[in-house]
């Protein structure tokens, strides 16, 4: 009742917002070295895994097959990140292709599902190699260079050097 003893009527409606549980994961792979890498160069990769959902993730597996990285993170809370590093040494096969692409994959159990559903992501990083240079150098020297007469024996030494950056065959 109001101060004059009149009945007062009204309604109060409550709004309830339900947040639906959702699992999400993100992986980012980076490197500082991106161009003109040579055979034997070591590329250091940083792999950052982040829980972008609104539930804690468990059994998080991070795989980078090229670098033989296989890590497991037991639990990754909402909004949290884990950072891993791994390395790869450039091989001649990479030089022959002109670049090397490396992929990081991540998966985790999806706690919002009753089955074996996983949340997954992957990211890659490509580095370019120096230009392939197939080159050979041949040097020929004699053990005697002057004062020769007909019938003298001369011994030659031939040195063949691969001064390129790829293996040569059938030389």
What are these regions (language model features)?
Residues 1-171:
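Exported/extracytosolic protein signature
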């Amino acid at each position: 009742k109001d101060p004059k003893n009149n009945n007062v009527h009204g309604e109060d409606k409550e709004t309830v917002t339900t947040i639906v549980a959702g699992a999400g994961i993100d992986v980012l792979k980076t490197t500082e070295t991106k161009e003109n890498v040579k055979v034997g160069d070591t590329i250091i990769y940083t792999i950052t895994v982040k829980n972008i959902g609104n539930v804690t993730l468990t059994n998080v597996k991070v795989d980078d097959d090229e670098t033989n990285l296989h890590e497991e993170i037991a639990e990754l809370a909402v909004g949290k990140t884990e950072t891993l590093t791994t390395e790869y040494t450039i091989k001649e096969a990479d030089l022959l292709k002109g670049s090397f692409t490396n992929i990081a994959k991540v998966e985790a159990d999806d706690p919002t599902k009753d089955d074996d559903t996983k949340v997954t992501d992957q990211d890659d990083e490509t580095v370019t190699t120096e230009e392939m240079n197939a080159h050979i150098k041949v040097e020929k020297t004699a053990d005697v260079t002057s004062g020769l007469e007909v019938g003298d024996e001369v011994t030659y030494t031939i040195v063949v050097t691969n001064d390129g950056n790829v293996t040569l065959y059938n030389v």
